[in-house]
């Protein structure tokens, strides 16, 4: 084992690691804005937010068109240039970037116009502006996109072409959906819709054509060629093909409601090898054959890894994979073993947990083994370790390591799709399979390289069918294929492989899980391409459902293009009988030899009219109940922010097919209600966009608080407060309501919603404290136990689950066996305001605190709002409370003046002058501690309810504490020995033998030398010719002596000896002995002439303070404002003197060179050292 020598790691004044540098082990902390990062974020957005409206428009602004600048656009070009080794001419490059910048500027204007129109859709001026902006945007895109197809540069410009095409399709969809409300006539809208459907095909075919051209261009025979080929395939899948595969969803008439797509294609990281370069001649085809052929999607369960050894080097020699069909609908199956079954070590089992493996950290090993002279040398290319990390949306899961963790990080080439959350939650791909590249060439080389396959996270483990969206399921997620069906490579625009059938019969079966009530009805659509007319038949659990005639879409022998595929369906709706069902698709009535390709099936909700009408009526009643009148000028006082969110959920769950216009109208009213709620809420950032974002406004809190997105209880962000290990360090969240926002003689109310809590304390503080401890049992969920999957495809809550029973009055009607929220989850506290004073700015402190280890809370929808003016008894009560508070404040001021004066004198006595830049020569550590204790006698430096909030005396307290801190710093700087008090363990000390650093009951760290052969030493730089004082505080147990020696390289040695003090000992240059040390210290008090004289006496209580004052102060503040027992622990307030038996000795030393050595040892027994100081004498 190699032992590192860290002797030279000590540096003056800082023997510890840099505290500003933090390494997050196992976490990818760098976030980039590369083309791949941007494209993954866009794909995530298109998969999750593909709904027309201002939200989609502004989302494109945030992700690309309002964010990406010239440097990022240039990066899109450089990415492909490097892959194909072709440079775009400067003119074409500048033209492309200028056009993209122009489109970005224009789209930002379009987005702002859209946002303003959506906020006020009946405004004629805004409607006219929307027509103008659409026409300008459409014209600009129609003109610009051909400029991204410059001859000879089609491939390098491909990724920016796709970005512009995506923008154009989104704008055309906007006019197809909103054009009539913008004032366009039906003929114009239909014309633009025809443009939309035509351009979906045009843009798709162009992108796939030039992708294939570029891919062919980078192919070559050697391993280096394959690496570039695979990189092109992987990166352009992410930046081009994934986006193109979602273009059909822009067809607003085929997909009028939210549509969920899945990408089942796989991408590949390179075989994990070191020195994997062009030296492997002719191996490209061999490596490509290592990639799996088109196949049904399966779910990786486990990898069993085998280890072999070669010339003393262990490596991954082979592995075996187990997997399950989609939905785990069938028994687990095992793949044939890859590589060889080595037996150099026990097999390692990697079992998939959480949401799958999202990251690998691999350690490739290359060794050139010398077998002798001549050509017998052998190269070993293997993998000797990999760490597998598991995805989770909630908490870190322990990784599994095969042998060791490496540095080849899969996230470097397949980054997360969301860098705002940890990679375990923001990941973009899961590990789907591992193959093995195996090669051996006799005595030349041995090669074993696992190759990892990755599938996009949108490919769900199951086939879930909810009621509120169109669900697209790729048929490669089938669990069985018919006898005439095969899986073939997709054409590039389908997001994965597809099925092919050449003879009539069953195509495939899928296991589907219904998350909607079984009464929900659906219609099935099929996206297919066919060289012949045919019939499709469907059945559920063996029960025939639909059959219909479908026409041919392409000629025999033709290439598969976007226009070859058609989406068609059955008109008759149906419903499922079981929550988990087998869906079967068959093809009939066509001649064998023809070709039928099926990409996916789609389940489209067929809304039942009376159900939709009932939902609409209920939503209308709930929305109208929010307001004080029909003109929606004001909110009812009892309408909470949580109430508005629930009404919003009710509106969002309305059918967009049945009552689209009514839904939009109700949505506008709810948004208006939410704006009114925001206007009356005096809290800053009530939706928790951040904590500790600004030092003087918004929320402040402890670092263990987390902000989480909405769940099935909260629509907006909410906070989670965990328990704490120590009452003096509570979990806390607070905010101050500024005096300027408050009205005199008015009652205000704090209210919100608590999902669950234990030992949650809530405070409102002004003249006194309003305090409540809230324990709310968690509901676990608002969803009934009968609902199996109340979550969406990306883990988001499905608030439209039909079993949810919600009452607009927020009264809970719980059926037996179900969970729900009830009134105890709503909390409110009120506080009365007397007269207001902007100069004093007393304000109101809002505090949430947990000081118990088993405490916790989840809360949100917080509001602080005006309730009513004070009159009668409540007015008299607040005036009385205000007067009482002012009387107490005056008494506090009298005491503070006295205590502050004495504390300041004690602090000033530590220093030479009022600049506080030099200590008195005789200032020692005990004097600094004593002054610090006196400073801590200042009361009300911080609020007793939460000691991080400054109180009325915070200013003077922090002034003196700052000087105390300066004194400590000057004292430490004066000591040229580093870590002389052992507070940092043995850092900066050289150790021989066995020694310990222990923390004693008085919270001091001491060095314990238990054995005579042990030695602790430190090399110290000094100034030759100057005088120094070596001061040591130590304690000797047992027989023998403890020694602290100071010496130079040659001679000039002196030492301090410590024993049990049986008899007096006299040391050179030091007349202090164990027996007379205490006596001498007492004499020093009268002998000193510095400002520290009499310090011991001044430390005691001063008789000038009135004897009755302290109890008066206690009485004054016992009424609602108790002292904080933790406040005395701030700073050095808990300092305790040394226990009896410790002795301080010192000697004078005059070095002749610039280096001295301090050595600590003993002859027998135990030697305990509290501190070692080497102080430079004053000149």
UniProtKB/Swiss-Prot annotation:
Looking at the Swiss-Prot or TrEMBL record, what is one Pfam family this protein matches?
A: Cry1Ac_dom-VII
What protein name is recorded for this chain? Answer: Pesticidal crystal protein Cry1Ad
Assigned protein family: Belongs to the delta endotoxin family.
A molecular function (GO) term: signaling receptor binding
Print the keywords alphabetically.
Answer: Sporulation, Toxin, Virulence
Which biological process terms from the Gene Ontology are attached to this UniProt entry? sporulation resulting in formation of a cellular spore; symbiont-mediated killing of host cell
**Does the UniProt entry include the keyword Transcription?**
no
Got any disulfides in this one, which pairs? Answer: none
